[in-house]
Amino acid sequence: MIVSARKLWETVLETRYRTGEPYLNFIDTANRALPQTQKDLGLKINGSNLCNEIHLPTNEERTAVCCLSSVNLENYDAWSKDPMFLPDMAEMLDNVLQFFIDNAPDTVARAKYSATRERSIGIGALGFHAYLQKKGVAWE
């Protein structure tokens, strides 16, 4: 059976529009954006996590590890005036990463190696629509 590339792409885009999935990952673009220091080490990105939030290099020695958390923008007014809120979140994520490094079993040595070398963390956001509703902001 021959499948039209255009029809397949249209189906992917239509499904993405209706469901939010599948997550699309353009690996060439991710590798072009890889920091030069990692390129100089011969590293490359081979994939991402499921939701495409993180793109970290992997190879025979390393398995990507990133500690993620989110702030709830619906509660932005409550935490935005605290200058230490985001730095404290970053420190908390780094502490979680350190706990993993200190307690990881040998069976995940590649993940421990990556966590130790890169210390990747990420702070995302959720609740933007709820914040706009709370503030009475019309949005189309």
Identify the residue ranges that each predicted region occupies:
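Function-dense linear segments that define catalytic or interfacial modules
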Residues: R16-S120, A125-K135
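Short, intrinsically disordered, charge-balanced linker/junction segments flanking boundaries
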Residues: V137-E140
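Polar, glycine-rich mid-to-C-terminal structural blocks
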Residues: M1-T19, I27
